[in-house]
Amino acid sequence: MTTTATTHEKTTFFATYDWAKSWQDLPWSHEAPTIFLAEICERRKPGRALDIGCGAGTDSVYLAKKGWEVTSLDFMPKALEYTQERARQAGVTVRPVEADIAEWVVPEPFDLVLDHGLLHNMDPVRHPAYRQRVLSAVADDGDFVLLHWHPRYPGQPSGRMGPTRTGREDILGFFAPELQERFFAREEFEDLPDLVGGGMTQAYYWLRRNRAHSHPAELVEQVRATFRRNNIDVDAALAKAGDAPVKPKLAATDLLARLVGPGRLGLSHKPLSPGDADALVRDWAERAALGPRAVANLFTLFTAQDHGDLCGAVPKCGQCDVRICKRQRYR
């Protein structure tokens, strides 16, 4: 696994910081905090935050002013100078760390991890090391915010300076199955210099731990608890089916695929065809030693009209105890 920054990376960043007369001159400088940070600050109490590639320091200072204990990490000394100076001017403090994220030893989990455009500037051979560090840094109930450029059309060049453009499905696949998308936003920039490949879509990801991956038994129990809450005896139907697939009354053939896809339980980070859903659930359950056929049947009955229609075409979220579900993100 390659971890050391390449000559191209170092040359590009050192040249840019040597050229800049102030933090405002940096091509990646921004006045407003990265999208999603304000909402995160409203939703949760301040904790430990890690700003990977802090750059001009805008996000580090914003979070520190909101009461967060901020670690500002960058391998460029001048980036840390800008960040600390802006923190002093704002009357707050941050913890500067001069290090390369791909080589840094993560000291503790963080409640919030932020990357405002570092990943898309890294050499792809270092991506596995980056991924490993991010997964180590995000706490079990933590949030990860990522800014990354997307191509505006298939095959769009990245330009001599980059950044590298990567589509949404590839980004989600890169962090799957450990992390899953909570929210997504995008901005369109139709015309930029050829040096950076012209226009781009600037994408923002708010990711969290995928508890269907890390806590599979908890998910199964939450489904069972929902049946109990609604006074539905699901065990009789499971016992009757045994090792055979159940055949309940369904409103649509794709309901199991919708249930376990990215819009609900998140067993898969991409949409599934109806024919693939049963096998995916059984594989997932087998890896978790949960009884593949029984779990697949349980999830199928969860979508069935004749077993409460709990998570069918119109899910009854108000009657549901499944917290490991994307539809519950506002609840």
Could you say what each language-model-derived stretch is?
Residues 202, 214-331:
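C-terminal accessory module of base-excision DNA glycosylases/AP lyases that mediates lesion recognition
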Residues 2-44, 48-50, 56-108, 122-133, ...:
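Class I (Rossmann-like) S-adenosyl-L-methionine-dependent methyltransferase catalytic domain
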Residues 117-121:
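Short catalytic micro-motifs in class I SAM-dependent methyltransferases
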Residues 114:
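A conserved beta-strand element that flanks and buttresses the S-adenosyl-L-methionine
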